[in-house]
């Protein structure tokens, strides 16, 4: 048994599969978040293209940004629909990024507010990816055997995040998969729901319409941070981008999540749920 444990540790080191990197932005990306936030805010717009079609429901803009010899793309959107069946707002893009930072989840690319053509909107650094989940499914691309364990944990983190922010629009095009099989999450403009549908039940549980989709394995430190969240702390982090009602709804979901995690621990055992 000891030899097997040593062998597993060796494999993880050889393939560079440290747990935080399996489902998150690279450490250097996290360390440079302030740099990218400033870049998104201050860089000159030297190119622009409005995206349309099936994969661009909100018709966002792909902006080419340049500053100090560096050039990057940014995704800008200004949709702001507060009524109807599917409320949709650029403000929730920024709020989702800030909640991601608050929890040190590190799965959402840098996102800030920026004016474009005189309008307020959100702009997110363009995330480079090998494919989307849609491509993976349609082309029947298998997850490499030595990545399956980490890929599954990435999906558990995605479910955790979407449960908390009440994201009802996690379709296959906004799961971005990198060349080394990390998972990046984009498109959160249909999050932070306040209706009973999103405060009485969680989106991802064993009762999911497409079959059981549980938060089956989670970092203990992440669950501790979830427990430690306060409305005041969240308000300080998200600022004007969430209303008091949206924050209240998020904490109703937080409480449901803690109950769900306790349920999973009883079902599978604490050592199998928290790592």
Language-model features and meaning:
Residues 66, 178-275:
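C-terminal catalytic region of ATP-dependent kinase domains
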Residues 87-94, 149-155, 244:
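Soluble non-cytosolic domains of exported or imported proteins
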Residues 1-8:
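Bacterial N-terminal signal peptides that target proteins for export
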Residues 18, 63, 76, 153-193, ...:
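Active-site acidic catalytic loop and adjacent metal/ATP-binding pocket
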Residues 11-57, 62, 68, 244-275:
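Regulatory N- and C-terminal appendages and interdomain linkers associated
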Residues 42-145, 163, 167, 179:
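Conserved ATP-binding subdomain of kinase catalytic cores across diverse folds
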Residues 139-162, 230:
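An alpha-helical support segment within catalytic cores of ATP-dependent transferases
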Residues 25-32, 54-55, 69-83, 186, ...:
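Active-site-flanking segments in enzyme catalytic domains
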């Amino acid at each position: 048994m000891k030899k097997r444990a040593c062998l597993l540790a060796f494999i993880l080191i050889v393939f560079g599969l440290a747990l935080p990197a399996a489902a998150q932005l690279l450490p250097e990306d996290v360390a440079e978040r302030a740099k990218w936030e400033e870049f998104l805010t201050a860089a000159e717009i030297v190119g622009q293209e409005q995206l349309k079609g099936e994969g661009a429901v909100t018709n966002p803009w792909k902006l080419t940004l340049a500053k100090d010899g560096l050039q990057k793309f940014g995704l800008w959107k200004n949709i702001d629909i507060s009524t109807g069946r599917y409320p949709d707002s650029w403000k929730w893009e920024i709020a989702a990024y800030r909640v991601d930072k608050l929890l040190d989840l590190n799965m959402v690319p840098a996102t800030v507010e920026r004016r474009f053509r005189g309008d307020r909107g959100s702009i997110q650094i363009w995330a480079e990816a090998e494919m989307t989940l849609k491509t993976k499914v349609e082309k029947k691309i298998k997850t490499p055997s030595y990545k399956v364990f980490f890929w599954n944990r990435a999906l558990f983190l995605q479910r955790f995040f979407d449960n908390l922010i009440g994201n009802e629009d996690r379709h296959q095009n906004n799961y971005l998969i990198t060349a080394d099989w990390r998972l990046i999450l984009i498109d959160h403009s249909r999050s932070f729901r306040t209706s009973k549908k999103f405060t009485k039940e969680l989106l991802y549980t064993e009762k999911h319409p497409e079959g059981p989709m549980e938060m089956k394995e989670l970092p203990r430190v992440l669950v501790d941070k979830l427990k430690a969240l306060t409305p005041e702390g969240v308000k300080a982090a998200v600022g004007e981008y969430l209303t008091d009602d949206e924050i209240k709804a998020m904490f109703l979901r937080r409480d449901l999540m803690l109950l769900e995690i306790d349920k999973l621990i009883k079902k599978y055992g604490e050592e199998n749920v928290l790592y």
